[in-house]
């Protein structure tokens, strides 16, 4: 019994072992016959799908498969370049592996299916000995013109060449007939060609129409031209480079619809133009537009035109509302040049020209002046002021020392002076690193004359050196870093006369003020003439010493952009960006002024020698003094942006942004103005378009200002806009050959202004020291003490502007573009000092208030023609028109001859006259 039991147990043990062996054999057979060796998929168990997808990325195909099956795709960011390429898939009830084979055809990618996961990765490189091939060819565009620098790469290898100056190429060591050559070129659709039996190729690349759509820089971002519904005008950089002036502002006049520019001086270094967008709509402070260079508030005066890549003018509320407090007067956006993918491109440019006075007034000569003065004297006293003998001596020039005849304006100015500009532009890069560097020099000479006999140089001249370097680096497929460094060094020399920043202006004033017969420029004995009441203009220009000024600026921007959608697909289209900027400006001046000893002729002695007397005892040597100053600005910005096209019809774009600016002025005249100027705000934008036909956009800016009390520091400035691109409608298809573009748009919004003229922290009162209260009739009975200086106004708040804009854009025959806008602005609560407060109120200085109202309306339009006549001739015409008229609706205006300052009676009284002359300038505009 025990033996039988033992045998029975052994049989059971052997039976179980045999079952295990059978299971292993069956498993091996199953794996052998059901799993393909190449794609590693279980074909018989894979689902079947029907797909009909046009021009979508491989990632979008994967998303569609995920939605219709239980499979999930896994891949790394390193594969995104090929996965973002677009394909078209049309299959009907095919298995998943067949679909994936088609999707990944002509790529270096393979896949592996494990349970419900599909892992996409690089194919293992299989080395198969083949006879290497040499492929030659020629690459042209759609017009048959050779393309230079086209990138040609054998797919999956590092075998790369580019086309030569004639569009020809030769690529060696091509693996074999199954190799694929990739042709890529900026602005053209990439092309892949299987080598096959070809050894010589003729390749034509088609322009990338989608990629070439014009992009317009807007507030805190960019938009495609067709989707812009704000009043935005762009200016080509080439138009800025025509003007030889130092300042870009001088090139704005007549170039941009809606921009009015006035240049008041041509003196080197002091020739910057004042400019306004759509006229002047306020009699308060802060009427100039906000200027942003690479997104940072900066001046246009010392940017070289060669640095600029794009120039946009934002005019209506929709375009400027995101700037809130700073956008009331419009915004100018300047983008400097960025690197482009391709081999290094080096451009050297040199300009040389001459400057001359455009128009000088014609003055009467000395004799005519004396005759006219005699006529005037006859009316007043009945006597002549000058004898006929003196008039004849002046006319004949027999004794210019005693009878001078001087045209002072011509005496102190040259007929023409040279100026020049040289620039070096280097641009290029790869997909990982793009670079741009611009070096520029600008030099010009002023119009004032010099005296070769003087041992020092009094010429008016300027030299400026600019540099701008921009780097864009893709650290990963989803992370980009932008670094921008720029600045300038400027040396300027002016005559030592005057403490004004623009001495030439004062010298010109002297030339207008002095009569032609007061004295000659210099006496025949070398002495410099001048009477006790007037300054010799020629001596002011040539013998007053000199001032040497050195100015420098360093500008920097650092930005990091993270494409969140590439890290997590459900957030496709979402990007985060952080920006930091630090700018510094410094200047110093060495003042080597000299007061010249001057004389005045009294006659001649018996021997004919000139007799003179000293009118002013001057210096024996050049004086020495120095001045210095500067400022610095820090800016911080963080933003989230979203852009997504849904179902091929619905385009949604959004922006949420926070910014902060800190500015310190080292030139402050008092302690209160030396404190940092700080602003911060939030901005947002949401836009939607349907099929590229209908557009709607909302913006707002929420800004804080230090100028107001606690309850009024923050202001909310919203806007809304809508547009209709008629030519994208189906019923317009037959008219597109003539009417290539027709778009209507309109906007309404609110923007703000917080600038006060000469009054910081206006909600706070100030305490001054002085004579205190006075009594009596003589005006000198003051008792020393403290008194209230500026009266603080707690409820001071924002100056607000309500803006309305209606515009139309018309394109004809794809070469004529017309843009026209009607605008209306109403500016309320304008900051001003009250004028009608009686003296009995007891204010030492009139308080500030939100009081004024100004309406401004008009229209601007531009016409642009760009027509090509064959390959060798191109016609470009541009014109614009701007009309603006404003009306002062409310102004706290004093009565005729009414005092403007409620102060003690012995102080000077200012009179305000209600005249049309003021309103013709500020009321009716330009």
Model-derived regions: residue spans:
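Short, small/polar-rich motifs associated with maturation and membrane association
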Residues: 1-467, 481
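Acidic, glycine-rich flexible loop segments
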Residues: 384-407, 421-423, 503-535
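Short, solvent-exposed beta-strand-terminating loops
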Residues: 355-359, 588-597
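Proline-centered flexible-loop/turn and helix-kink motifs
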Residues: 252, 257, 512-517, 648
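Residue-level detection of beta-strand-connecting loop/turn positions
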Residues: 156-158, 187, 295, 526, ...
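Extracellular/periplasmic, surface-exposed regions of secreted and cell-surface proteins
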Residues: 240-243, 287-288, 416, 420, ...
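Conserved small-residue
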Residues: 347-398, 497-498, 868-926
